[in-house]
UniProtKB/Swiss-Prot annotation:
Statement: the UniProt record of this protein carries the keyword Cell cycle: yes
Pfam name, any one: Condensin2nSMC
Subunit-level organization: Component of the condensin-2 complex, which contains the smc2 and smc4 heterodimer, and three non SMC subunits that probably regulate the complex: ncaph2, ncapd3 and ncapg2.
Cellular compartment(s): Nucleus
GO BP, one annotated term: cell division
Taxonomy of the source species: Eukaryota, Metazoa, Chordata, Craniata, Vertebrata
Entries under PANTHER family matching the protein: CONDENSIN-2 COMPLEX SUBUNIT G2 (PTHR16199:SF4)
Keywords tagged on the record: Cell cycle, Cell division, DNA condensation, Mitosis, Nucleus
Inactivation phenotype: At 3 dpf, mutant animals exhibit cerebellar hypoplasia, a reduction in the anterior structures, including the optic tecta, and an increase in cell proliferation in the head. At 2 dpf, aberrant mitotic cell-cycle progression and an increase in cell death. At 4 dpf, renal defects including renal aplasia, hypoplasia and enlargment of the proximal renal convolution tubule are observed. Morpholino knockdown results in reduced head size, increased cell proliferation in the head, increased cell death and increased renal-tubule diameter.
InterPro entries in the cross-refs: ARM-like, ARM-type_fold, Condensin2_G2
Cellular component annotations (GO), alphabetically ordered: condensin complex; nucleus
Protein's name in the database: Condensin-2 complex subunit G2
Residue ranges of HEAT repeats: 460-493
Amino acid sequence: MSKRKQFLDSVHHEHVQDFLNFIKLHKDGADPFDLAEILAELQKSQRQDLWDRQLKLLQHSLTVSPSERWITGAEEDAGDMEVEVSEEQIQTMAVIEGVTIVSTVSVDALQEKDNYTTLLKCAQMLNAIESALPLSQTPLQQAIHWLFECWWRRDLQGKEELGWTAFLVCLENTVTLDKPVSELRRLCSLREVLLSVDFGSEKGQQVIDPLLQCFFRASHIKQEEGKRFLAFLFSWNDNFIRMIHETIKNQLQFFPKTLSVHVAEIYFRAWRKASGPFLEEIESACIQDLMQHALLLHRNSPVHSKVRQILTYFHKQKFREGVDEMLHRLYKPVLWKALKATNAEVRANATLLFTEAFPIHDPNMSSEMVDQAVQKQLDLLFALLDDPQPLVRSSAVLGVCSVLARCWEVIPSAVITDLLEKLILQLANDTSSPDVRCSVFMCMSIILDNSLSHPLMEKLLPALKSSLHDSSEKVRVAFVGMLLKIKAARAAKFWKVCSLEHLLARLEMDSAPVSKRIVNLLFNSFFPVNQPETVWCERCVTLIQTNPGAARKFYQHAYLYTAPANIVKLMLVIRKCLNVCIQNAGDEEFASSNKENSTLLEDVLSVQDTSSMASLLEILVILWKSVQKSLMANQEAFKYTTAKFGSSLPQYLKIFQEERCKAPLILLASLLPASALPALRSKVMSHLRSLKAGAAVTTYSQTLECLCSWGQISHIVELIENWLTEAAPVKEQGDEESTGKVHFDVLEESKPDLGLDYLDYMLLRPKTRECLLTLPLDQMRPLHKALNKWKSLLFSSLSGSEVSVAAIETALRAFIFHGRLCIHLQHKFPEEREFLKSLEHSVSWVEKRVLPFLVNSSSDQQLSLSTKIVESCVTVCKNVLRVSVGDSDFRDHLLQHVASVLQTEKGYMCIPHLLALLTEIAHGCLSQKAEGQEDQLSLTIRILTNIFQKVVEILAHRLRKDKEEGQELCCSSEEALHDFLLVTKFTSERSEFMTGVFSSLCAAVIIDISRPLQKISHVEELLMPETVNDLPPLSSTILKVTLGCPAVTRFFLSELSSSIESEAIDSITQWAAVTHILTIIKESDAFIVELKDIAGSVRRQIQNYYNSISENSDDIQRTIYESTVKMLNDVLISCQQTNN
């Protein structure tokens, strides 16, 4: 019996196993049995018999094991229960698989006159059960779906139902899978299925959301198959087009710019393929809507640039048939109107669209009408360049340049010349807007991309040369960018547009963004890497002699445009040049005899040319610093370079003795390791010792940095310590013996001021400070101790001893530096409180030794010195807290110190500094997490607010005692008081700190304003304040500070309201004072609610008060009452008007 006959017989429920064996053989690639060959050999009747038999087999299998009894994935995965799948279900799954395979092969083998009704029934049965298959049968589901897909492709009867199933599955997969490329291809091939489903039907509504989700997916939008599918969706239903468009608009802000171009392509494809009502809908609902958005959206909108990108894609398709006509028709009702809009941003947006789509015309019009339309549009370009708004003019400049670049060949030459002259001669010099000038230079690059423009541009561009010196940096950047474009496009000689002299002058003085571009422009001229290295050096010398400042700038940025190896080569060739100059200077007879063989450099340069020598040395340092990291990374190159310069540097130091040469030589030495210059260290230290007090920073800065880079900073510290110790006014017994060091330079003059200058320089610069603080404590403690000793001289001066002014100044500086050094050391070594205790001892010393002179000073000199000492101590302590070095104990110690200062007779003179210290204490308290320390922190805040109240009282007292001095004190305290009140933003409105601070301020202001009112003896003396300056000095100062910050003003008004509600204010003069405060605050046009509430409360209380004493009131009280009520009414009316 043949295989064909055996297979046909096996398709029966009684021979199921044989059937399954044949299916297994078909799936086995190594076996020759192939169902496709078997079906191809079957006669028509045999194929019909096969389909009938397999239908019955499938029906029998589903009767034996119906889908309702199948064990699904839920049961298979159920907890700890083991669910066994029956033999019947296993066999049924195998039969379904076999039937699916036979059906799929049969679809491919169908012939024209075949009756495939039973095959269709079989496929429909599979369609009915595919969704009920267990999760483990996913491959079987996929095989069934493939059968339906093949059915659709063959365009067989019943394809709609089967194709819909396949379409839904593919759609779901493309939305859910991370990499849906293959599914996208299948979905695209099945897209026509969608047209068989009505949009309004249940099936149609079922797929709307998944279809719209496709527009969220970047994979769909970018892939070719995805674009085809998404563009096809526009042809399903006109209502669906609007839904698609709204979905895309909502997603545009989240799309990257690169994706917007693909979205534009989808729109364009949809438009190209659409016709009839679909075309009308796409044009009106989508394209024209995008046009409207591009015109009306703000430029800072996240969507605007994406909408512009989509329309730009359409504009670039103008060469395609029908695009020009469509753009002309859709722009007509919106664009020309927008170009004349009153809103400048709309006009600017319209300008960009108009120039991008230029020329906008209908190809179906006659040539005469087209010419007329284009001429009108050219006239419009000129009008836009003259627009009164800079934003529109800038947009017009960009647009005109893009039009000229695209349409140079078709625009009349006279019009081109007029437009370019407008840009270059007028708008490039637009004094009203740097943005317009910047646009001209940036957009010239667009025109230069068209080579046809070069001859005319070469004639016109030199008129722009003065723009290199424009007052706006961004204009200068754009101008140099234009020169770079001219050079790259070879449109003209850039030095004919702007001379080399001007470029070098601007390079010398300009900022990095401009100078870097100038270096790029001139790089090949002064650093021609394709020529011999000697030429590099010659160009370097030429640049130095032309403009030394520009030369330094040029080589500062040269590393950006060449390899580090070339920079090192230039350094070495400059070294060689210097060596030759030195050699020639030492052997003049040899130099003169060898003149015929001398190079150009040897003829130009000589050691006596100090300026050129110094410039070459400076450039060496600049070049080395620019490639220092690269050199360090290549140790072989580093060792070679340091060896070369290490051998030459001692000779340079010997020959080049001029001051200008010494600085770069020291810097060059600092870049070399100390081992390369063993003899130089002593010379450097000798230089530091030889300087005189008051020497300029430039004379020692490089030397200090050089020693730091060598790791020799300990020698500087030792020198400073020796000078301070030897010049110290009081030497403890055994000090010199206890140092354990022998000093050979004790006969030298001590220079403590210069030592303090060195210390100041090292503490201020991060690099030197880091080096200083890396020293071990054993080397830092002697310096710390030496600084501390100078306190005794301050006390001696206060005690009446004769001390020179210079010595006092030195002692005061040493006292300050002692505090500064303590801060750095405590921050570096926070484990213990050694240096914090030292600061506490200094504070205690001030209290014990200095504060008595604030109580009773016999001379102005004593008072001035004691005040300076206290202020210096307070400033140091403030900085301790500012850098978070102090702890709670230190903070409490400082509060006690502030209280002690305020109790002295002249302590008020330190109030500005004390307020600054209180600010840092308050900030620390309010920002501290008081876990387990709530009581201590609360006590500290209470003491703080009491001290602040004392400060306010002292200010009021000084004003009463000496008005002029009090006013000066208020003015000097204003900034510190402002900073103190800003700390209140770190706390809640009704906190203990807030209440304490603002209750003191409110009371002070009310008392200060009401006191003059109580002294009025005549009605004419009553004056109403108009500004804060009309108030008494203390209240004026407090309100100025309060009104400087809305949050502080709100806290002040809150406390004022609480005082009124508590009825703590009970006199007509105090209510008048409150009204004066409200009158001043209302001028800010803010705090309407607070002002209205307070004014209402005051009016009620003052009315009740006056009703009770009106019979006994005198004329002055009545006048104060009437003026107060009038001001209150003005405040309330003002609040009402502001609300309206």
